[in-house]
């Protein structure tokens, strides 16, 4: 596991490369890497994260959708307990997020569609939030507009770099 390797080599930081699931796994492991606890203790059992046990993470996303590269939330599945829950803590924010649209050029159309709709869902959720700021509403509207304009283009022509750039922009 990520956590086991981090502890074996006494990692000072980690680089997560991928979409939402690999990002979330790495965030959870980084949050407790210097300690001796198990992820389940924090994820399923509610143990508090000690920021002194965390190591920094660099997030390199290969999709445009989950926004995991810029959040402090990690959604994991505990298969033994049949639970899918979020864990979150300020220690889980990636220190650096690298969003390079060229890394999304090989994403299959069905993943492009589902992550693109995830971007739209995030934009609508942010816009409709009970507590929000006007700047957030403006960003949400802008993001939704980008999705409506560019998602179909990215889906129909996966190697359209401009469409991929605009979807990456919409996702953050």
Q: What is the predicted role of each segment?
A:
Residues 3-99:
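Glycine/threonine-rich beta-strand-loop-alpha-helix active-site module
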């Amino acid at each position: 596991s990520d956590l086991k390797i981090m502890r074996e080599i006494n990692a000072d930081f980690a680089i997560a490369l991928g979409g939402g699931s690999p990002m979330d796994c790495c965030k959870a492991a980084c949050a407790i890497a210097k300690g001796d606890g198990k992820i389940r203790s924090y994820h399923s059992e509610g143990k508090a994260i000690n920021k002194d046990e965390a190591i920094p993470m660099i997030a390199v996303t290969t999709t445009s959708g989950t926004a995991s590269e810029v959040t402090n939330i990690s959604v994991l599945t505990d298969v033994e307990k049949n639970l899918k829950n979020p864990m979150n803590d300020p220690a889980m924010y990636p220190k650096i997020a690298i969003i390079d649209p060229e890394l999304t050029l090989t994403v299959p159309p069905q993943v492009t569609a589902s992550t693109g709709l995830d971007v739209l869902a995030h934009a609508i959720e942010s816009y409709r939030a009970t507590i929000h700021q006007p700047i957030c509403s403006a960003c949400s509207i802008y993001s939704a507009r980008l999705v409506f304009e560019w998602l179909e283009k990215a889906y129909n022509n996966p190697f359209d770099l401009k469409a991929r750039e605009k979807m990456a922009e919409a996702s953050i």
